[in-house]
């Protein structure tokens, strides 16, 4: 997908030429070439620190909060984590449009509650997906996860 298509609904400034993006990624170790690398500020690390290595690993463009002295196109936004979520929705074609979603929060009982709701919905004839800390399920298909709280990009990939 071209950067111009990807960013059509995002408040941003684009530096550099329009290019094709093969995937959206925020972990520089997972780059294979052609991706948009999202520089996300975290509690302990700032993804901007990995931008140079991401470009060396084949990132086609960067999502950043400030312009970096690198020769690839850059999408500059106020909040890269928020923009990554918007771009993932666009990239994966708005996969949740028209699909009911139930979110469960709290300290205790979330896993039990989700599996109870899943069982009830399936008995009622609905096809059910479940995103949880243990695993992700879409119908009978198990989708492994390595994070207890998936990032927006993983969620959109699973929803697709």
Regions found by a protein language model. Name each.
Residues 1-86, 90:
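N-terminal leader/targeting and accessory segments in enzymes
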Residues 10, 84-160:
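Phosphate-binding loop of NTP-binding sites
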């Amino acid at each position: 997908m071209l950067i111009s298509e990807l960013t059509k609904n995002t408040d941003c400034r684009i530096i550099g030429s329009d290019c094709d993006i093969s995937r959206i990624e925020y972990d520089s170790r997972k780059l294979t070439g052609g991706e948009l690398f999202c520089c996300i500020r975290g509690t302990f690390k700032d993804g901007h620190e990995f931008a140079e290595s991401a470009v060396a690993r084949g990132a086609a463009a960067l999502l950043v909060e400030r312009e970096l002295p690198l020769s690839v196109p850059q999408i500059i936004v106020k909040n890269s984590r928020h923009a990554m979520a918007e771009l993932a929705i666009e990239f994966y074609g708005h996969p949740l449009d028209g699909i009911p979603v139930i979110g469960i929060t709290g300290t205790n009982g979330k896993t039990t509650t989700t599996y109870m709701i899943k069982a009830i919905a399936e008995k009622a004839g609905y096809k059910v997906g479940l995103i949880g800390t243990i695993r992700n399920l879409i119908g009978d298909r198990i989708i492994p996860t390595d994070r207890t709280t998936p990032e927006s990009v993983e969620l959109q990939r699973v929803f697709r």
